[in-house]
């Protein structure tokens, strides 16, 4: 690679926690607002929802003068084309990321992984990333699965000197007024006791819970 490229996986062992939406939001913000060169590798097969989303966007723009004008205005403001979104498998994600980073001279590659550890190559890909972002929701079953897998991965990474993975970073997502505050508070405390990295993503309506966070905030 002509410059160091950060590889970041978006992963959770349960679906429905907002992985794909988060991937698009992060990539778009860093690409268009922070002027970083980014790309997304969609490994969430077989649906590949992000690849399909990009194809739908292209068709919509081609068929709509209004959307064409929006794209032109965005280009005038940012002078940046749309970032690449390519499909791959979890097993081949690292290889695809390296090739893409070399070709596009990227700063960050986001890898959207399947929502199950049973998919071939997920564990291998995770430990070969620089960082893993893990959106979490206050659901007992989701959190049990999430923490079990994450601690296993981190223990493995610490025991292997040649593993690139530096950290798994958690944050709460999809919090609503009817969310289970007991689960939220309990698992926030557990993650603090385990010294896991947790971003402060708590809405104002939950600040009375005084949830523990890491020094990353």
Stretches found by the model and what they are:
Residues 33, 103, 128, 193-194, ...:
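Alpha-helix C-cap/termination motif
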Residues 215-217:
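Acidic, Ala/Val/Gly-enriched low-complexity intrinsically disordered segments
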């Amino acid at each position: 690679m002509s410059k160091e490229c950060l590889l970041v996986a978006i992963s959770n062992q349960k679906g429905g926690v907002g992985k794909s939406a988060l991937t698009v939001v992060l990539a778009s913000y860093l690409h268009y607002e922070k002027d970083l060169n980014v790309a997304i590798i969609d490994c969430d097969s077989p649906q590949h929802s992000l690849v399909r989303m990009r194809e739908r966007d292209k068709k919509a723009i081609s068929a709509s003068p209004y959307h064409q004008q929006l794209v032109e205005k965005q280009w005038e403001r940012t002078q940046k084309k749309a970032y690449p979104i390519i499909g791959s498998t979890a097993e081949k994600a690292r290889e695809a990321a390296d090739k893409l980073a070399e070709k596009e001279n990227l700063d960050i590659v986001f890898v959207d992984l399947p929502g199950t550890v049973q998919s071939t190559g997920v564990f291998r890909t995770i430990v070969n990333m620089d960082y893993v972002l893990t959106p979490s929701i206050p659901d007992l079953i989701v959190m049990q699965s999430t923490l079990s897998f994450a601690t296993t991965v981190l223990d493995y990474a610490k025991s292997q000197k040649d593993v690139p993975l530096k950290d798994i970073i958690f944050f709460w997502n999809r919090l609503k007024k009817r969310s289970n505050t007991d689960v939220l508070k309990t698992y926030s405390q557990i993650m603090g006791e385990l010294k896991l990295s947790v971003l402060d993503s708590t809405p104002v309506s939950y600040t009375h819970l005084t949830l523990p966070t890491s020094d990353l905030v």
